[in-house]
From Swiss-Prot:
It holds the Pfam family CbiA. This is Cobyric acid synthase. Keywords: Cobalamin biosynthesis, Glutamine amidotransferase. InterPro entries: Class_I_gatase-like, CobQ/CobB/MinD/ParA_Nub-bd_dom, CobQ_GATase1, CobQ_N, CobQ_synth, GATase_3, P-loop_NTPase. Belongs to the CobB/CobQ family. CobQ subfamily. Catalyzes amidations at positions B, D, E, and G on adenosylcobyrinic A,C-diamide. NH(2) groups are provided by glutamine, and one molecule of ATP is hydrogenolyzed for each amidation. The active site is at C334, H431. Pathway: Cofactor biosynthesis; adenosylcobalamin biosynthesis. GO terms for molecular function: ABC-type vitamin B12 transporter activity; catalytic activity. It comes from the Bacteria. The keyword Nucleotidyltransferase does not apply. GO terms for biological process: cobalamin biosynthetic process.
Length: 495
């Protein structure tokens, strides 16, 4: 089998590429096609674990779900996980290969391009259709000579492109026409069509502009996607969306999460944000954690020691310790769990610069960073309730200490996490727990009696994916979109 393929690129970050791909994947699956998502290169600290112990971007895991598939490393062959302002861990085919500065990474682009094309070839041999997501914008012409995420991939693989513009941020006409103006003519020839995303109001008012864009670019207009409420119910991928999240409001339980500088896998909060009983909000840098919250949730981070120092620089350590002294609840997940302990040690510089830092001291545990990374799906039982749980681990530390004798979970691989003697401070390495309805309801009930609900998170995600697909079908020429897909090797321009 040789699949057809089509690529969605955007005029910038956060224009909605990830959810557009997810919606088109669900549409293709509903039409009976075997379809797979593909993102050549992603930059995100939100990762998902694959069954074989690899990791990919969580956006590709959601797109896989839209296809009816489990996450696979070929869906995102290169994942960059920022560790500092200048360095990132490079994940290739699901496995960490190096931590590099930008210049060193660029020197490896030929090797990485080979890894990308290798994964793409495997997918095109297995599926009817591959829907590809670009990264950022193809108009970043300063990066074009080393690009493997946008036109560098599209031209190497011969995949036609649809360009998405975000009208909500303004300037969408300039963004689309400007992209055509600044990119290489051979790159522009790869673009077959465009669409407008996140429109509010009467789309008829924009129809004349659609004709203008078609005339100025030579690209076909596929339509105008309105602001779809389903998109807000699906997991956000990156920090751009995180900064735009507002408090959910109205719930009986108030949960605050400090916005760490290298926060990772913050989609652990999505099921809580969807709960009617929960008022969940992120606390941005420079603001104190309110005193009246019921729970402080410390998320994972790509740089535990670095974010421990960042947390202290914001004064959040004082807020967290005061919360604990007054009987408040605290839960740490992954790196957040590590921070709750007494010491964080990184003798080999696995997590950043080598060294050690005191933790918050709320759990009698110590963590040592190790080069061997643990990445795996897990199943087990909640130690407090005995309920079955499942999730995944992605971490590089080993945590030991007296409080670990009171584990948070019982897993076949051994006990996980720790609980303080009074039961109010808890930590776990396992992500994805709150996506399970029974566990989430029991945990909320333990925080405050009568606060649990019968919300079904998994079903709500499936419903949102279907609504997203319905919205695309109602407002875009989806038949034309699928007709544009071509067999790999198609050439709209010389490579």
């Amino acid at each position: 089998m040789t699949a057809r393929a089509i690529m969605i690129q955007g005029t910038g970050s956060d224009v909605g590429k990830s959810l557009l791909v997810a919606g088109f994947c669900r549409l293709a699956a509903r039409r009976g096609l075997s379809v797979a998502p593909f993102k050549p290169q992603n930059m995100s600290n939100n990762a998902a674990a694959t069954a074989d112990g690899g990791e990919i971007g969580r956006a590709q895991a959601l797109q896989a779900r839209a296809c009816g598939l489990d996450p696979q490393t070929d869906f995102n062959p290169v994942l960059l996980k920022p560790q500092s302002d200048c360095t990132a861990q490079v994940i290739v085919h699901g496995r960490p290969t190096a931590t590099l500065e930008a210049a060193d990474y660029m020197a490896r682009r030929d090797t990485l391009r080979g890894a990308v094309l290798e994964s793409f070839a495997r997918l095109t041999a297995r599926f009817d259709l591959v829907i590809v997501e670009g990264a950022g914008s193809p108009a970043e012409i300063n990066l074009r000579d080393r690009d493997i995420a946008n036109m560098g991939f599209a031209r190497a693989a011969g995949v036609p492109v649809v360009l998405a513009g975000d009208i909500d941020r303004g300037g969408v006409i300039a963004a689309l026409v400007g992209t055509k103006t600044v990119i290489d003519p051979a790159d522009a020839a790869m673009i077959r069509a465009f669409l407008i995303n996140k429109f509010r109001g009467d789309p008829a008012l924009f129809e004349p502009a659609m004709a203008d864009i078609e005339r100025m670019t030579g690209w076909a207009g596929l339509g105008i996607v309105p602001w779809l409420s389903a998109a807000a119910r699906l997991p956000a991928e990156d920090g751009v969306a995180l900064e735009q999240m507002r408090p959910t409001g109205g719930g009986r339980i108030r949960i605050a999460a400090p916005m760490l500088s290298r926060i990772a896998n913050f989609d652990d909060a999505d099921p809580l944000r969807a709960e009617p009983s929960v008022d969940f909000f992120f606390v941005p840098p420079g603001q104190a954690i309110p005193r009246d919250v019921d729970v402080i949730l410390l998320f994972g981070t790509k740089s535990t020691l670095g974010d421990m120092a960042f947390l202290r620089a914001q004064g959040w350590d004082h807020d967290i310790l005061a919360h604990a002294r007054t009987g408040g609840r605290i839960l740490g997940i992954c790196g957040g769990y590590q921070m709750l302990g007494q010491w964080l040690c990184d003798p080999e510089g696995v997590d950043g610069a080598a060294g050690e830092l005191p933790g918050l001291g709320l759990l009698k545990t110590d963590t040592t960073m190790q080069g061997e990374k643990t990445v795996r799906p897990v199943t087990g039982q909640c130690a407090r309730t005995g309920l079955p749980v499942s999730g995944y681990e992605i971490h590089a530390g080993l945590t030991r200490g007296p409080d670990a004798a009171r584990p948070f979970l019982h897993l076949p691989e051994g006990p996980d996490g720790a609980i303080s003697p009074d039961g109010r401070v808890e930590g776990t390495y396992v992500h994805g727990l709150f996506a399970q309805d029974a566990f989430r309801a029991a945990w909320l009930e333990n925080v405050r009696a009568g606060a649990s609900s019968d919300a079904a998170y998994g079903a709500s995600v499936e419903a949102a994916l279907d609504e997203l697909a319905d919205g695309l079908e109602a407002h875009l020429d989806v038949d034309r979109f699928f007709a544009l897909a071509a067999a790999p090797g198609w050439r709209g321009a010389p490579s």
